[in-house]
Amino acid sequence: MQSLFPATRQLLPEIFQRRLDAAETSEAALALLDAGVQDAELLPYLPDLARLEQEAFTCARAAAPPHETTAEIALNPTLCLVPSRWQGLSDLLNGGGGDEQAEPSLAAETVLIWKDPVTAEVRVEPASTNMLLALKIAAEGLSAKEVALDNGLRPLDLQRLLRREVRRGSLIAPASRLVRDPRIVSPDHPWAWPRYARAPIFTLQWHVTQACDLHCRHCYDRSQRGHMPWTDAIAVLDSLDHFCRTHHVQGQITFTGGNPLLHPHFTELYREASARGFILAILGNPCQRKILEDLQAIQPLGGYQISLEGLEEHNDWVRGPGHFQRSLRFLSLLQELEIPSQVMLTLTDRNMDQVLPLARDLHGKVDRFTYNRLSAVGEGASLQLPRPEAYAAFMTEYLRAREEMPFLGIKDNVLNSVCWDENQTVTGGCTGFGCGAAFNFLSLLADGEVHACRKFPSRIGHIAADDLTTIYHSARAKQYRTGPAECLDCRVRPVCGGCLAVSAAAGVDITRDRDPFCLNGPRQEGEEV
């Protein structure tokens, strides 16, 4: 009985400890406690505490639940719900009981007990209303979207609630079906990082319109493309929803353009996307407060990214007079409205020396600052990239600057090779998985063309001809997803793959040749991460 009721036993007088130890069955022990409470000899909550311990003991002896092998989201088979007349008992089982421990109070509570699918540890926690709602959805196979509407929740909030319970282990869920080619990431490869093998989020970068209120000197596409009819736009949302459900990933839409806010029905499109439970973000230009407030009322933005191309004079030469100051005012507005903000810079030979001065000016004004190298296509063909050796020196300087400015992000994948060489932690690079072209990311243009990456011509289909699932699994998409053959043996390939857009603009074979700015050769024999 000492191993079955350790917490309860600690709270018993010595005479009752001996009686508990002498009990032949757990039922006899519980009866002893009930009698002691009735005679006012024991703390009144001890029988309920003992019943929790009994369930936890049974759970600990159960087989470890399956991890990511279920076909649908489901209850952890070891999960049990235990009604209790007392609140605060779980604290006594989870290492509480010190001088600061609050005495359990007489109030009904449901306690959840389960074995974690990953750690095999037994967890004992009081059930909140949201936790019970998530369990009900899984147990009864309910539609999360319908439940969200019935309970006055946003679908995304309910999706997050379900994912939270999956992370905690009270629910089990199928693994993401967005899996890297084993030549890129595999547990069999000692230099690979398994956490980059599966993508939990799929992003559709949707260029909803070509209309733009700027005319930037490095724009990669000024072609005229009409936006799709409303019914087709709704079909896109449904196709993305189906893709995410069947591939067991969270969907995200990053609206961009042009300027996405110039789409004639953008607010309605945003509302429809929210109703399907997607994470929503914007890559756009500064806008008015009222527009942001209206969007926030529908669903808080996951992020708003604007672009700056250097210090004020150079930026306004690229993006137009007054753009720099408008952008600074807009960043203040994003902070005021508590919208996550990001500034993106397109790096050229003209502004490379302005990146860090600009970052210092933005310190405290933006949540994240990143850059990508110029894709010299479209109007960007008139600009130039820096020389590779100059860029290599810059990358080292940039990484060192991150020590004083941790809001500097790594979006250019080749920075990870420098991180590796300088014993710094590598990051997910451009999309969280190195080059994510046609892996955890696709671009949809205003007229329905689907590209692996928007920064260079990489068409893999048309949304009017095929749905996203068909396009994603096409041979052409797989080619972009695999990337250059020269990269496959690289020590940082799981978080790199170079930049296909830069390579394509340089005229190299992107299926064979590595990024012309790459600093690495092939992986050396026996080299490990």
Where do the model's predicted regions map?
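Long, charge-rich, low-complexity alpha-helical segments
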Residues: 1-68, 120-205
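Flexible mid-to-C-terminal extensions adjoining Fe-S/redox cofactors in radical SAM and related proteins
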Residues: 184-187, 454-529
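Low-complexity, glycine/alanine/valine/leucine- and proline-rich hydrophobic stretches
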Residues: 80-136
